[in-house]
Amino acid sequence: MEVDEEKPQIIAENPNENVIRERNAEIVSGGNVFYNPVQEFNRDLSIAALNVYRQRLTKERSEKALKKQRKKVKEQEDEKTTPVPEDPPVYEAGTRYEDGLRILEALAATGLRSIRYAQEIAGVRQIVANDLSRQAVASINTNIRHNKVEELIEPSHSDAMTLMYLSTQPEKRFDAVDLDPYGCPNRFLDGAMQCLVDGGLLLVTATDMAVLAGNAPEACYVKYGSVPLRMKCCHEMALRILLHCIESHANRYGKYIEPLLSISADFYIRIFVRVYVGQAQCKLSMSKQSWIYQCTGCETFTLQPLGITKPNPTAGNPQQLKFGIPTGPAVNSQCEHCGHRHHLGGPIWSAPIHNPEFVQDLLTAVQETTLQSLGTQRRIVGVLSMVQEELQDVPLYYTPDKLCCVLKLEIVPMLKFRSAILHAGYRVSYSHASKNSLKTNAPPAVLWDILRSWSKRHPVNPERMIPGSPLAAILSKECTAVYEFDELHPEANPKSRKSALSRFQENPTPHWGPGTRATIMIGDNKLPKSYRNQNKKQRHKASEQQAEDDQQDTPQAVDEYDGDVEHLPKQPKLEATA
């Protein structure tokens, strides 16, 4: 598979220093500050999102000003004066604007992200590049001067949480806060919620995917307040767990979130949300969260919302809603498909995780503006195209390989499976989080019925029909409908697949991952882990043995010997053995 990532250029000026080039930014790094080149896609996507956010924010402010002007004219009863909308201002990247965005990068490290923001985002007033490490702040200062962006970037040496708590006054708040920590971002969310303006943009990265994917549910509950389940859709579940965590922090201050874009890529997840103030909207948060039941046998999942809303129109408020608590549980004590019991996980965010209008604006900007020269532009287009095709009202997904594994069946080809679902009258899509995903509004009973129909063509070995197994329980039932596998549905093959877009790319380098703290992960300064750990135990034992030999060969009292034989340490007597 073709890889479209452009590798950063590295110029070694001395043994302890590298100059890293990414787009127009140059970073001087001596190996003491964290830099990870694999997150270029993350940085490119963030730059594109902030540019689109600034455009939308400018439009919203213009509309708000026009509405205020019309109200003022109406109060004055001046019919001759008609407010004329002003043309939106034109911004250029690299120039300071007093009415521009104020951005905080709370964990800046080398300052690469902030420098790229200053160079590539149009309409910026100030970027605060903060880090707790003195070495990192020194590196930020060096890199700011090296790239000549002193006018736009203000370095800050402070604890990220302290800085955000000290920025809660209206005049000190930020339009956008970028949190890209090493691991879990939960401890920074509380401060971020308080230092954002109304309608501000929060950009959050989480790299502790092992925790979010269900390997340590107890740790995930401590960090995110949610219990994950080990499922094939674990990457989308990770997105929904993080959104649930962000929403819970927002609700404490009478705020709520609107997810614009939620991406699972490589070894991390990246979320873009707008944070608004509104007590009435906060009440809807309960209905946006759900528990999830997962069968321990066939792994069928069912969602149980925490709250429900019903229309309750009145003369004064036709849009009024009534809030209620749903009845439950949503499943029986035993699975209706295979008879096994259930695991309970969550709560997770069960509302849409993308804003289709924002995604469309972002896709247009990446294809038609100066953003089309981004290093990972081709991959961004592919991922956003898949996001557009996703079913926004269907949380989580199945995978054909896992469904067929439960029934010990030959795997149904993806296009045939999608076609059968579409012919049955349901909707289906991929998820950007997995190339084998099957996101559909078809109930699980229909999916198992399709596989029962498939088993007629590809029978299961009778020896595997063990009583009490999910396989035997599901295949013992008769098919309730006839499903079409041979005639391909016109919508079975999505546009992103037909266009051969870069949807899922292979790892471009060995040991593609989050890297380690405070070190440069490129060049010859650091050997690959596989080489460093070769014969590690043998080398450790050899060094210990050498240390013992050196200790035995060295007399302990030689330094105290003054020439008198009587002062020499006595040698132990050797006993003769028979």
Curated annotation (Swiss-Prot):
Q: Does the keyword Metal-binding apply?
A: yes
UniProt record, GO biological process: tRNA N2-guanine methylation
Using the UniProt record, name the top-level EC class of this enzyme in a single word: transferase
The annotated region (Disordered) lies at 63-92, 491-578
Ribosomal protein among keywords: no
Q: Please state every residue range assigned to the domain named Trm1 methyltransferase.
A: 18-451
Q: What is its EC number?
A: 2.1.1.216
UniProt keywords (A-Z) are: Metal-binding, Methyltransferase, RNA-binding, S-adenosyl-L-methionine, Transferase, tRNA processing, tRNA-binding, Zinc
Q: Which GO terms describe its molecular function?
A: tRNA (guanine(26)-N2)-dimethyltransferase activity; tRNA binding
Q: Where does Zn(2+) bind?
A: C295, C298, C335, C338
Q: Which GO cellular component terms are attached?
A: mitochondrion; nucleus
| InterPro entries (alphabetical) | SAM-dependent_MTases_sf, Trm1, tRNA_met_Trm1_C
What this chain does, per the entry, is described as: Dimethylates a single guanine residue at position 26 of most tRNAs using S-adenosyl-L-methionine as donor of the methyl groups.
Family per UniProt?
Belongs to the class I-like SAM-binding methyltransferase superfamily. Trm1 family.
Protein name according to UniProt: tRNA (guanine(26)-N(2))-dimethyltransferase
Task: Name the source organism.
Answer: Drosophila melanogaster (Fruit fly)
Please name the gene that encodes this protein. Answer: Trm1
